[in-house]
Amino acid sequence: MSRVYNFSAGPAVLPEEVLQEAAAEMMDYKGSGMSVMEMSHRSKWFDDIIKDAEKDLRELMNIPDNYKVLFLQGGASQFFAEVPMNLMKNKKAGYIITGQWAKKAFAEAKIYGDAVELASSADETFSYIPDCSDLPITDDMDYVYICENNTIYGTKYKKLPNTKGKNLVADVSSCFLSEPVDVSKYAVIYGGVQKNVGPAGVVIAIIREDLITDDCLPGTPTMLKWKTQADNDSLYNTPPCYGIYICGKVFKWLKKMGGLSVMKERNEEKAKILYDFLDQSKLFKGTVRKEDRSLMNVPFVTGDAELDAKFVKEATAAGFVNLKGHRTVGGMRASIYTAMPKEGVEKLVEFMKKFEEENA
């Protein structure tokens, strides 16, 4: 069977070049006589893999020396708890609610302290990013938390919130390495990277060193203390070795393709193709305010649930898979992450035009 165009929100499409390299090395990684799946995380082979991955990531993102890079497990959902456990010194933090994942992080933080809603776009089904220029931040807040790209609803912060000097924590799960960022504007950047970077099972966290201390909330498990992981170079216990190996290959692919500035241009070009069609379509329509549209996740609807289902079914049969919207919102969603080729978006739009002609 030929490969399909995979529009899954995550785990998601990976560069074919990376998959081919991994396939070639599956039985024998660089003369080791072993697959990376089989080798010890304490081996020289894997030590080189994880160090090389960090080096390439630091180069791609221009990560300052006073930030630690951690390769972790547990998904973004576990990290929802790690943030307050490690950062809530005053037991108070501000959260901006722009979708399901910010809501879940907010609910988790409430377990550990006084989590305050600073702004929300729930009033319009999270179809926009609220004004974050003058948030009701108080002096005793330990940090301000955002989900920078909202995978389900298809919104993206185009400008970071004014945190009034407070530490900014950002979940970038679905926009990680899709464009250049100024790491120094954040205290913590993290994501479950099974969208733009690798397979499921790897969390990458970039944390300013002064925030990595023994001063965690009482009862914080040893494994969930960032200092435990930082002191052991992400090797306190067995890490997700194969996932890190694939991430490392994606980092090298991104560098080979020209880096994050080039990736942003490519991602903007792909998104424009799809959004331009949606803006003139008589059948399909987007669901997000134009100024807040994500380059990564594009939700759309026909306005008829039965027609939506028909579209998803026929698209799947035509080789455009995983277009069904998240179960909480319905409709459709095309996730066009960095590894999705422009051709995939162009062919999807061709199919949508054909479907519109037959069903409008």
PLM-predicted stretches and their roles:
Residues 10, 109, 120-176:
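Active-site phosphate-binding strand-loop segment of PLP-dependent enzymes
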Residues 3-54:
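A glycine-/small-polar-enriched, mobile loop at the entrance of the PLP active site in fold-type I
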Residues 77-144:
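PLP-dependent aminotransferase-like
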Residues 32-79, 86, 100, 108:
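Conserved N-terminal alpha-helix of the aminotransferase class I/II PLP-enzyme fold
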Residues 15, 193-275, 289, 358-360:
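Active-site C-terminal subdomain of aminotransferase-like
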Residues 284-315:
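Conserved PLP-binding catalytic core of the aspartate aminotransferase-like
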Residues 2-4, 317, 330-360:
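PLP-dependent enzyme catalytic core of the Aspartate aminotransferase-like
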Residues 169, 183-194, 203:
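Conserved active-site segment immediately N-terminal to the catalytic lysine
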